[in-house]
A protein has these predicted regions:
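Short aromatic/hydrophobic "clamp" motif used to bind/position activated sugar donors
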Residues: 79
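Glycine-rich, basic loop-to-helix element that forms the pyrophosphate-binding segment
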Residues: 55-74
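A conserved acidic beta->alpha catalytic loop
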Residues: 28-37
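Conserved catalytic core of nucleotide-sugar-dependent glycosyltransferases
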Residues: 89-167
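The conserved acidic donor/metal-binding loop of glycosyltransferases
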Residues: 83-87
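Conserved short acidic donor-positioning loop in nucleotide-sugar-dependent glycosyltransferases
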Residues: 13, 29-30, 57
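Active-site beta-to-alpha loop of glycosyltransferases that engages the nucleotide-sugar donor
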Residues: 1-8, 30
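Short, acidic, metal-binding catalytic loop of nucleotide-sugar glycosyltransferases
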Residues: 11-21
Length: 168
């Protein structure tokens, strides 16, 4: 039940994937907001879009559906768990590939409004909460100004989005 976020997130991935061939695999956990219909439409339009659906009536939850996506839908060597309300920044996939090694997980830094407590895996910075309120220019300017401070910085915090090799 996150269709407006899913569309926004999909657009950000396609816009910012760079030269990478990105397969997008979506799990629909018995939604009722049109998400599954949109997924069916996207599978017809985008050959790198795949979706699985839990037919319900009981929801299965993220963990079970993530396992299904990785094992049943994904075909690329690198998998990334990504929530529907996330915006992929330019260069993110290059950074993942730069840091990813066997038996490791790479988590991108999240930049989000101060809705939840701070943590080592995120930066609190408000660029809008809803997709229609999102200020991409503000985010890009912030990243350009602060990129020198974070160059090659790693932390121990882990939360989505995270990437790993499918074989692991």
């Amino acid at each position: 039940n996150n269709l407006k976020y899913l569309k926004w997130s999909y657009d950000s991935i396609r816009k910012n994937q760079g030269n990478h061939e990105v397969e997008i695999c979506v799990a629909d956990d018995f939604s009722n907001d049109g998400t599954w219909d949109w997924c069916l439409e996207m599978m017809n339009k985008d050959p790198l879009f795949k979706a699985i659906r839990n037919e319900g009536p009981t929801r299965l939850g993220h963990t079970i559906l993530y396992d299904r996506l990785v094992n049943e839908a994904a075909t690329n060597d690198i998998c990334m768990i990504y929530h529907a309300d996330m915006y992929l920044m330019p260069g993110s996939i290059d950074e993942i590939e730069k840091h990813l090694t066997d038996k490791t997980i790479v988590s991108l830094t999240r930049i989000e409004p101060p809705l939840h407590p701070d943590g080592p895996e995120k930066i609190l910075f408000d660029c809008g909460i809803e997709p229609e309120e999102f200020h991409e220019e503000t985010l890009m300017s912030y990243l350009q100004m602060s990129s020198k401070d974070r160059s090659n910085k790693t932390t121990e915090g882990i939360f989505a989005p995270w990437a790993f090799y499918k074989k692991d």
